[in-house]
Structures are given as C-alpha cells and as structure tokens.
Amino acid sequence: MATKIRILPENLTNKIAAGEVVERPASVAKELVENALDAGSKEVVVEIESGGRRLIKVSDTGCGMSRDDALLALERHATSKIATDEDLFSLCTLGFRGEALPSVASVSRLTISTRTSDSVEGTEIYAEGGRIKEVKECGMAVGTVISVRNLFFNTPARLKFMKSAETEGGHVGELLTRLAISRPEVRFTYKNDGKVVFRALDADLKERVATMLGRSIASFLYPVSYQEGGLKVSGLVAAPECSRSAGSHLYTYINGRFIKDKVVQHAILQAYRNFLERGRYPVVAVFIEIAPGEVDVNVHPTKHEVRFREQGRVHDAIQNAVESVLKETPWLKRPAVAAVSRPTEKDAAAARAVLEGSQAPLPVTPQPRPALTSEKPVPAPQAQPQQSSISEARVAEVRELLVDFQPRPQPSLRPQYQGSVTSKEALPYAPMAAPVPVREPETAAPEPDPAAAGYFSSLGVIGQFNASYILCQRGTDLVLIDQHAAHERVAFEKLKGQFAGREVDSQGLLFPETMEFSFRESAVLREHLAELARLGFEFEEFGGNTWLLKGVPQVLSATRYVDTIRDILEELGSLSRSRAFSDIQEDLLARIACHSVVRGKRTLSQVEITALFKQMDETDFSSNCPHGRPVMQTLTLAEVEKMFKRI
C-alpha cells in the first residue's frame, strides 16, 4: 500500500519557508537592513523600483563576507550569530535564524556583492529561484550590496497580493523609519524609483525622531529616563495633542529590536489613560533594555512579539517610567482658577486693568467731564512708566471675569484733534459711558405650534444638564438629547448628501498650510488624492513628505482639520484588496462630521437650541449618531414616578 505522507522537495519547502519570512517588499528590506546593522554598518542605503517588485537594493558599509561565508549564507539555517542552545537565550543581534537570505533567494533573482577589509577583491554571487547560477570575483569597497530583482517571479499567487507601488513603497518607508529611530548613530538613505525620499544623518534620538516623523512634533517631545534593578527605560514621549487614531506611532524597542508587544503597549496606554480621549493613541519612541536571558524573542516569525520572564515587573516599570514624565510636563502646570460669582461692572473694569498690564489706573467713580469745544490740539499728559507686578496666574484668574462683558465701542476724536496725539504718548482713551448692563438670562422662547413644527421643534426646552445634554418635555414625557451626537448626526447627513451628489463642499484656505507626514502617510496620501478631493481636501505635493493643504471641507473648523486628515490617512492606510474605498467612505464622512462639531461641554443659548432642533427636523434623522451612540432617550412620567416610588 502506497504511503500518503511524503517528503516535500527542497524547492517547495524553500517557498513555504519564504512565505513566513517574505510577505511583501518591506519584509525583504527588513531582513537585509537588519543583517547590515548586525554587520556593524554605519551607513545603509535602500533603493527600490516599482514598489520593490522590480528591485530592492541594500548597500552597507559593514564588515562584509568572505567568499566561503557568502556561499554559506545562502544555505538554510546557516548563521554566524549563534552556535549553542545558550546563545539562543542571550541574543544581542537582530537576526539569528539563518533563514532570511535563502528565503529571499528562493522567490527572486538575487545578487550578492561583498568584500571584507582583509581581501583585495570582493565576491559576487547570482542566484535564481534559490539556486546559485554564478560565482565570480568583483571590485568593490568593503561592505555588502544585495540586489533582489523580480520578487515573487516564481510564485504568481503571492504576487497577486501585492498592492500598488505607492503603498508598498510606503511600507518600506515605515520599516526604515522604525529601524532609523532605533539606530540614530547610523546614516540611512531611502530612494524610490531614483528619487531620494529621505536622507537621515547620524544624530541624537530627538533629532532622528524629528527627521523621521516630521519637524512639527519636535517641540512636543519629552525625554524618558528610568531604571529599576537591571531594567532600563529610555526614549521620548509626545504631548497628548500629538495623538493619533491608531497605534501606528507607538515605536517600542527591546534591546534595540522593534516590537509590537501587547504588554509593552498596554503599559504605555495605561500611563496616558488620564491624558487621552478614548480611541486615541500617543506618539512615543520607548527603548527597554533588559538582560537577554529575561526575554524570549524567538516566539514569532517576524520577531515582533516577545515573552518576558517577569511580565508584571516589566509592565509596571514601563508604566512608571512614562507616568513620571507625564506628571511633570507643561500641560499640567496650569494656574487654578477659583470659582467666582456672576461678575459685576466693577469686577470687569478691574479685570481689564489687570489684563492691560496694570499700566492704567483701576476704575474709580465716574465724574462728569466737560465737552471738548476748543479747536486747539489737546496735549496728552506724559504716561508714567510703571513696573507691572501682575502674575500670569492673576491674569488667568481675572480673564474669567470678562466672560459676560462685550467690548464697548471706542468713539474717535474729531479730525482736528487726531493729529496732535501720538500712540506712544497717549493714555488709553476711556470715555465716561453709562455702566455696561449685565446680560440677563434669556427668557424662554414661546412654545412652538406643534401642528406646524416638526418633532424636535415641538419639544418644550427645560434647560441643559452638564452643558452636554438638552432636557425637554413633550406632553408628560421627559426627553434627553445628547447635543454632540445630535450635531454629529446632522453634519453627517449633510456630508453624505453632498458626497452622493459629486463631492463634499470645499473651502479654500487663504494661506495654504504646510503639513509634514510620515513616509507611510505620504504614500497613502499620494495614492488617494482623488478620493480625498471628493471628501473636500485639496492637497499639492511640496517635496519629500511635505504637502500643501489648500482646501478643507466647509463643515470643518479651522482648528480640527489637521487631526482629521491624519485620522483619515490612518483609515485609508488600512485598505486592502478585499476592502475598497467605497466600503469605508461612510466611516470617513462620520469622522469628518465628528471633528466638525464641538466636543466636550458647551452651554447653548435658546437660539442655538432652536436652530439645532430645526436642522434635526430637516434631516433624514436617525436615532443614533454615525458611531452608533444614541442621540436621545425618553423617560415617561410613569418611569420617573417609579424612580421616586410613587407608583
């Protein structure tokens, strides 16, 4: 009887093994660059063509290989980095399995050119589909150059899963970003289709992070330095305002190796838990140094996940390290503002004097002033310079007193008096006007006619709760409306209608804004320019990863569109062949709608509530916001009385 189990041929096992190691061009670049760093290279140049499908070339200035070593490097499980079982648990290198080069060679046409410092000439090896075709001598500098051409030429099924050249190039750029941040002392150059995407010179960590993630983030980075026993945590953490909608900017490293470990990421998120909104992620570059025997990095094919011997201790150390920095950073050092009662005219006048730097006298009882009748110029008395002793805390406190007072118009002098007084010598003009009346609470609007009004407009407004919920009455029912969710639903339906027509209404910016993106974000933006234009965003490439933002959706406020754009790029970057733009367009419109309305607490006037209810009546309204949260809840009189045990 014939056996059903058989030994697979070598060429097939090589392809299976390559499937674990070589997922896309970025996987090839990762293996080759890590080998270059392990070889002690101080400069790495990565070049790709057609997103890496046509060419991936990595050049380094490392120690190089002899002829015999170069030939052995193409054999499976051949490595110079470990020799015994003990070595496997005391790793100090990025690679150790001896699988990278043979796996890459089995699915490409590969050329290795290498030379050591004690050799006069180098060695060049050409392999195709995992088989060595040619070995010869060559002239070159010390180091190694590996060229990978026609990736997946013999595995067409895998080739079908590759995405566009822009997307694959973005993944290579993101991979190099991770490695460049981990080794700021090494120079990195990345070229895509002959164009230099970035060149990172050797620098300190902060300069390297700014180079890779954008200069705009540099002023928001704070250093981490923490040690507990044999565990050390260092790096940089960014202010909460730099947060992202996904964890793509969590750059975490164990002994110099980039990882995506759940324990490490959870510790960082716990440290930020009181600083970020739900669903937001910080920007960090955190390095953990621990004895190699305390961590196992050989638990995942990509080595992105690790296993700690003392998981709880590592988690707490990372959380404490990040928390200790966040507790000392400027966004917590704000002067406390004491609660004040409703300000009076006297309070407001005193507050204005403080905000003017104490250069003007505090208000006194108004005295009548004779009218100006002379045609002669009016000389102004010399202002006496005074040293202001008003602290910033005092300024912050009294600003609150001005909240209910509108600035009064300042009447100008008649023309014959204007030429004789200069701005440098004149005291501030303070006309003796009648006291500014304190704004009284608005009276309730008249009850709308239920027959003429829609459902929401017919509600009787009781007031607001916690500056977040509108309390209304309809008959004997108590209706509670989440004002943010309601605003969001209205904005979403408006955007959806515009998008269905052709595109979202865009507002051109008077002064285009310069925006810096990461390499992956820039690649996503370049690929989806047309879709972003339909959403109302107008971009123009400015060079490298810098873009000019020239237009935004009309519904977005001036302070929200930067965060919105980064969130949308994060969403677009997650698209795959099975998930097209049309599948997420409503999610993107919902995100724009969410960013276009006021978040948090806000006191609404009766006029604003009436306008909101009118918009809700005119909208094809749903009982939930675009994210699924309810817009309103209704309590019947019976339910309320049951709460108070009346029935």
UniProtKB/Swiss-Prot annotation:
Any one biological process term the GO annotation gives: mismatch repair
Biased segments, Polar residues type: 413-423
GO cellular component: mismatch repair complex
Region (Disordered): 356-391, 407-428
The keyword DNA damage belongs to this UniProt entry's keyword annotation: yes
Species of provenance: Citrifermentans bemidjiense (strain ATCC BAA-1014 / DSM 16622 / JCM 12645 / Bem)
Keywords: DNA damage, DNA repair
Record's protein name: DNA mismatch repair protein MutL
